[in-house]
Design a protein with these regions (language model features):
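Structured alpha/beta reader/binder surfaces that contact nucleic acids or chromatin modification marks
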Residues: 1-186
């Protein structure tokens, strides 16, 4: 099963239904081709590198501090959520991203940094349907997973029919937010 590496604070915001989108450009290892959504279903692998209070909106600072206090120290990581891609859009206009600020945790400064990185590539906006796993899994962190790469393989079967996972937002609320975001993007 594929897993997408994402800041732990973002994983927490996704799990709490406080955001349903990701803004991705790609890391150093993906510079030439930019970020690609290689999988429509994947685990969310929380990372603890690079996330900082200088990059997020002030109302998410307490969430960041909570996540930092729970940073794994034993060479293991806990995966507690799973996502399915609902839609993908590419955006090159910073003003559109500013209109989406209530749907994600990043601040304007960080969005500017990400937009300016590999400036010929657009920002990918990935709308996600996120599921909280009833039985989180603990994995040994492998050295080959280190660094700025987005996708990693994790041996874990994902069952069909939402077995063992619950959507973090009920259908009506999720669809309402998707419609609001799509209105901004169109």
């Amino acid at each position: 099963m594929a897993a997408l590496k994402e800041w732990a604070v973002v994983c927490k915001a996704l799990e709490e239904g406080r955001q349903i989108l990701l803004l991705r450009k790609g890391g150093i290892m993906e510079y030439r081709q930019g970020f690609k959504v290689k999988h429509n279903k994947f685990l969310l692998f929380p990372t603890f590198e690079h996330q900082s209070k200088e990059s997020i909106q002030p109302n998410y600072l307490s969430m960041l501090y909570s996540v930092i206090q729970n940073t794994p120290t034993n060479g293991k990581n806990k995966i507690t959520s799973y996502a399915e891609v609902a839609d993908i859009k590419e955006v090159s206009d910073k003003s559109i991203l500013r209109k989406l600020e209530k749907y994600h945790i990043w601040n304007d400064r960080y969005i500017d940094i990400r937009m300016n990185y590999n400036s010929k590539r657009p920002m990918s906006i990935i709308l996600l349907r996120v599921y909280k796993m009833d039985n989180p899994i603990e994995v040994d962190v492998k050295s080959e997973w280190a660094g700025c790469t987005s996708w990693i393989p994790i041996e874990f079967p994902v069952h069909s029919n939402n077995d063992g996972r619950q959507p973090v937002l009920e259908d009506r609320r999720f669809n309402q937010i998707v419609d609001e975001i799509k209105e901004v993007l169109n």
